[in-house]
């Protein structure tokens, strides 16, 4: 597995992976608008977005973040791992990549919205606390990023 910044040539494979991941969670698959224009939604704003690819250069995971204006905080977005590749450390590796970049860019607090209903997003509610995140609202967690 390799984690690298998103490139447009991976767009369709990324979209397919996200739709598959949502379907595996019992969600009606749809694509969020930001995933259709990652350059505009992330990079053009000074934010970041990564993909994890396997040995065949296929997308198996992703994560991004957007800084919250006029703060030293950012929201994590779109942490997905291909359904057949969960529990192999890919999500943890992607999260660490994002947190490291946030720290390097002066971001002190990472926030994440967990989705609803909680029953469908149960993996998020279990995953983030294992990595130091805590609830600050019914469906939102945060983590203070230490240097």
Task: Give the positions of each predicted feature.
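Active-site beta-strand termini and strand-to-loop segments that position acidic
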Residues: 53-55, 144-147
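Conserved GNAT acetyl-CoA-binding A-motif
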Residues: 95, 102-116
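Extreme N-terminal starter segment of soluble prokaryotic enzymes
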Residues: 1-2
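Acetyl-CoA-dependent GNAT
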Residues: 5-77, 82, 95-96, 101, ...
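Residues forming the Rossmann-fold NAD(P)(H) cofactor-binding site
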Residues: 92
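Conserved active-site tyrosine of GNAT-family acetyltransferases
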Residues: 128, 133
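Conserved beta-strand-loop-alpha-helix junction that forms the acyl-donor binding cleft
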Residues: 86, 111-124, 142-146
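Active-site acidic-Proline motif in GNAT/NAT acetyltransferases
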Residues: 82-88, 100, 116
């Amino acid at each position: 597995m390799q984690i690298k910044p998103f490139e447009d040539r991976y767009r369709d494979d990324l979209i397919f992976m996200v739709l598959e991941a949502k379907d595996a969670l019992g969600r009606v698959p749809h694509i969020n608008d930001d995933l259709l224009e990652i350059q505009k939604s992330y990079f053009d704003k000074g934010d970041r977005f990564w993909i994890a690819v396997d040995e065949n250069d296929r997308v198996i995971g992703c994560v991004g973040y957007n800084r919250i204006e006029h703060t030293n905080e950012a929201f994590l977005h779109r942490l997905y791992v291909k359904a057949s590749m969960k529990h192999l450390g890919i999500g943890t590796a992607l999260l660490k990549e994002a947190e490291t970049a946030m720290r390097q860019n002066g971001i002190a607090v990472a926030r994440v919205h967990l989705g609803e209903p909680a029953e469908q997003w149960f993996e998020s509610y279990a995953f983030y606390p294992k990595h130091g995140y805590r609830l600050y609202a019914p469906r939102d967690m945060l983590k203070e990023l230490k240097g």
